[in-house]
Amino acid sequence: MKILTIIGARPQFIKASVVSKAIIEQQTLSEIIVHTGQHFDANMSEIFFEQLGIPKPDYQLDIHGGTHGQMTGRMLMEIEDVILKEKPHRVLVYGDTNSTLAGALAASKLHVPIAHIEAGLRSFNMRMPEEINRILTDQVSDILFCPTRVAIDNLKNEGFERKAAKIVNVGDVMQDSALFFAQRATSPIGLASQDGFILATLHRAENTDDPVRLTSIVEALNEIQINVAPVVLPLHPRTRGVIERLGLKLEVQVIDPVGYLEMIWLLQRSGLVLTDSGGVQKEAFFFGKPCVTMRDQTEWVELVTCGANVLVGAARDMIVESARTSLGKTIQDDGQLYGGGQASSRIAEYLAKL
């Protein structure tokens, strides 16, 4: 069976790397990889693929920039051309990006079956572009590979049991990736802090595009640096520019954006993770670190339920107090919430039996 995999963001490459390895092990499966170009940066170079052992894409569409509609529309057109040329038996998409939706829509309109990895996730916040993407992708997919029990419950609540789609609980491929690459972790350049620091990330538009929320978060980070523990903040130039334009000053240790292997290194040595990233919430759990999430909702409600994650929004006092009480807390994956690192093999084995 020929599988056409659509990816466009760096996290999707990292997830796809372990699934592609599992697909190769199945003699009845072959894979064509399409990179839409949604996340365009220097780190998506040949060195990036070699460092992580990620298969190089068969197609590079180089589509990035513009509005959500412009980007998705251009992707839809070019992915359709690839599907018509390659004639795959199935299209495989990951997560909730514009690349995900474009790949799913292109396949659906050409009547090619779709498998969605990370299906069933919901933040219940329709202002998030990702929420729209994941809901629409689930609707047109016929195999829904869910990472958690909560994701399956979400699909059941939306009536998917009455549809022809197959719902499969495989676990989370992000855990597979984290465990696989943990031994390759490398330290970032210019880090001055000792182990036990607080690792912070800040990039989500709901925080960086809202001056009130961003000001509150910056003030909280500065207070934590002074009164709780040293804070290490890998920061994208765009976010740094927004902070400077608001006249705010960060007192924490700001470092340049880091790659995946450097991020794992930081996670392994931190005492707490403070983030607004969906993926980093889980990665903190994979490495046994408590997490404080600066968002009003999360797709990973099971982490809040089990006490590994605290949702605090952007309120300064809540961020500071939660950081103080969570720092150094022991987190154990007793229940194997995310499949224990076997999701990719389960996905490949399921596809091979079709």
UniProtKB/Swiss-Prot annotation:
Gene3D superfamilies: Glycogen Phosphorylase B (3.40.50.2000). Its EC number is 5.1.3.23. GO terms for molecular function: UDP-glucuronate 4-epimerase activity; UDP-N-acetylglucosamine 2-epimerase activity. The keyword Chloroplast does not apply. Keywords: Cell wall biogenesis/degradation, Isomerase, Lipopolysaccharide biosynthesis. It holds the Pfam family Epimerase_2. GO terms for biological process: cell wall organization; O antigen biosynthetic process; polysaccharide biosynthetic process. Plays a role in the biosynthesis of B-band O antigen for serotype O5. Catalyzes the epimerization of UDP-2,3-diacetamido-2,3-dideoxy-alpha-D-glucuronic acid (UDP-alpha-D-GlcNAc3NAcA) to UDP-2,3-diacetamido-2,3-dideoxy-alpha-D-mannuronic acid (UDP-alpha-D-ManNAc3NAcA). Exhibits high specificity towards the substrate as UDP-alpha-D-GlcNAc, UDP-alpha-D-GlcNAcA (UDP-2-acetamido-2-deoxy-alpha-D-glucuronic acid) and UDP-alpha-D-GlcNAc3NAc (UDP-2,3-diacetamido-2,3-dideoxy-alpha-D-glucose) cannot act as substrates. This is UDP-2,3-diacetamido-2,3-dideoxy-D-glucuronate 2-epimerase.
